[in-house]
Regions:
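ATPase nucleotide-binding head domains, primarily ABC-like/P-loop NTPase cores
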Residues: 4, 63-255
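Interdomain "pre-motor" coupling segment immediately N-terminal to P-loop NTPase/helicase cores
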Residues: 46-69
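A conserved P-loop NTPase coupling/switch region
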Residues: 1-53, 79
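A structural signal for well-ordered alpha-helices, especially hydrophobic packing surfaces
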Residues: 15, 22-25, 29, 58-61, ...
């Protein structure tokens, strides 16, 4: 049996006029890319430096623009052990609501270094903790801060236990991650560190969570004048009676 294949006049005409256009385009693109690569390689180090400088300039312009538009103030950086913020604001939260209430913060050897916040859900505890951490961080990167005034002592590390999502791929529950974060903060923190602890102990029973949180806070209090800046929020209303201050008053604790 003989089979004849015939092409319509229109496809034949297109094949004659256009041909293998797409492969030719790809080949031409490849030639251009190879020429560009050959041109760039000798100047790669210079281009990399220029890109980094442009990125830094972009960041500085963005910081300056944000500070000017939102009336940020220049913080005072000191070597003293102090975090003193007057009417601080959360840099993102204040953009989302019209009636944001500023909050002041004082953590120093003369006031207290361990601050515990208690209160109902949605009362602003987490926002306040994040606000403190963000203002301290912004001051350390050379940025103005959202506050009327700020006196920030140099911080060597910021440790946080704020929000945890379980890591199934590594077989770690949210509570296990919480414990590891707290362990890191306790073992690695120094007198110049800032530690933010938000609702630690929710991933286990109420009794165990209360005991763990009290033990962690007591660990910091036992350091006395070496205690870092610690800010804690908790829903455990009875936490005070489990702290060392219940029988041995400490000048470093504030509720």
């Amino acid at each position: 049996m003989t089979i004849f294949l015939s092409m319509d006049i229109k496809p034949t005409e297109l094949d004659r006029l256009i041909g293998d256009t797409h492969p030719e385009i790809l080949a031409h693109e490849m030639r251009i890319m190879m020429r560009l690569t050959k041109f760039i390689l000798p100047h790669l180090e210079t281009l990399s430096t220029v890109i980094k400088l442009c990125a830094q300039l972009d960041c500085l312009i963005a910081i300056a623009k944000t500070c000017k538009e939102n009336d940020y103030k220049r913080p005072v950086i000191t070597t003293d052990k102090i975090i003193d913020i007057t009417n601080g604001r959360h840099p993102l939260q204040e953009l989302c609501i019209n009636n944001y209430v500023p909050n002041s913060t004082k953590s120093s050897m003369d006031s207290s270094l361990v601050t515990i916040l208690t209160g109902p859900n949605s009362s602003g505890k987490s926002i306040y903790l994040k606000q403190v951490a963000l203002i301290v961080y912004m001051a350390h990167i050379g940025c103005f801060v959202p506050a009327e005034a700020a006196n920030i002592g140099l911080i060597d590390h910021i440790y946080t236990r704020v929000q945890t999502v379980e890591d199934i791929s590594n077989r770690m529950s949210a509570f296990l991650i919480d414990l590891r974060q707290m362990s890191l903060a306790i073992q690695e923190s120094s007198t110049k560190s800032l530690i933010i602890i938000d609702e630690f102990g929710k991933g286990t029973s109420e009794l165990d969570g209360l005991a763990l949180l009290a033990a962690c806070i007591n660990n910091f209090l036992f350091r006395e004048d070496k205690v870092p800046h610690v800010f804690v929020s908790t829903h455990f209303q009875t936490i005070a009676q489990y702290l060392v201050t219940s029988y041995m008053p400490s000048p470093y604790l504030n509720f």
